[in-house]
Amino acid sequence: MNKVRTCWNEGRPALAGWLQLPGTLHAEALARLDYDAVVIDMQHSPIDFGQVAPMLIAIELGGAEPFVRTQVNDPSDIMKLLDAGAYGIIAPMVNTRAEAQTLASALHYSPRGLRSFGPRRPSLRYGSGYLAQASETVVGLAMIETREALANIDEILSVDGIDGVFIGPTDLALDLGHAPLVDTEEAEVVSAIAHVRERAHAAGKRVGIFCGSGGFARVKLAEGFDFVTAAPDLAMLSAAARQVIADARAL
């Protein structure tokens, strides 16, 4: 069973790390912390497929569920990542029901979807019984990042085969005419985020959000979000380095 899905089945939200730097060592190190999942960001990072495959192994070895935010909502890319051992897919810029259906079809085998059969790494974890439980091992979230997606939110949420939606607050803020801040307090953006959360839960779906800090993640967890990421690795590295430098220079 997918660890994130286990959290949800037990009535708990899932907390995830976020990786923008390539490499297996720090991927495993983060996965060994108290994260339920670790997301590899292939959209806004230099990480390519040759790098992501061993990172998926490292995250699984560390004990967290390996997720990927894909470059685009492309079925061939999604299927390849699933075969490489991704157990969660976050697809960017899903604006319509048709685009959500594209994501859903890539996540599931026939008759529920169009995923091609070749689960090289999943079959190592789940054995010969993988096909029968494949849909339960994968979590699929469609990113809500535009005014168009907001207008179509109920249609997107009506798609069978996706678990829910994941809010990208910076692109959403930008498309609504505001500064692209992660932990935004802009009233229109805050209202839009709350609306997505409410519509998702009304539809019986899960809702996640990207957060830039642990404090903001705590707020979103308290608000009822089901899947929350808290600060990417590069931001945490920079913040820690700034603090070390400040401590060293505090003469």
UniProtKB/Swiss-Prot annotation:
| One Gene Ontology cellular component annotation held by this UniProt entry | cytoplasm
| UniProt binding sites for Mg(2+) | E145, D171
**Binding of 3-hydroxypyruvate, residues:** R69, T170, D171
* Keyword terms, alphabetized: Cobalt, Lyase, Magnesium, Manganese, Metal-binding, Plasmid, Pyruvate, Zinc
Site feature: Increases basicity of active site His: D83
- Cofactor note text: Shows a slight preference for Mn(2+), followed by Mg(2+).
- Please convey what the UniProt record notes about how activity depends on pH: Optimum pH is 6.75.
Record comment: activity regulation: Binding of substrate induces a dynamic movement of the metal cofactor between an inactive coordination sphere to a catalytically active one. When oxaloacetate is used as substrate, activity is increased in the presence of micromolar concentrations of inorganic phosphate. The phosphate does not improve the binding of the substrate, but exclusively increases its rate of decarboxylation. Excessive phosphate concentrations negatively affect the reaction rate by removing the metal cofactor.
Matching entries from PANTHER family are given as: 2-KETO-3-DEOXY-L-RHAMNONATE ALDOLASE, PHOSPHOENOLPYRUVATE CARBOXYLASE FAMILY PROTEIN
Q: How does it assemble?
A: Homohexamer. Trimer of homodimers.
Q: What is this protein called?
A: Hydroxypyruvate/pyruvate aldolase
Tell me which species this is from: Rhizorhabdus wittichii (strain DSM 6014 / CCUG 31198 / JCM 15750 / NBRC 105917 / EY 4224 / RW1)
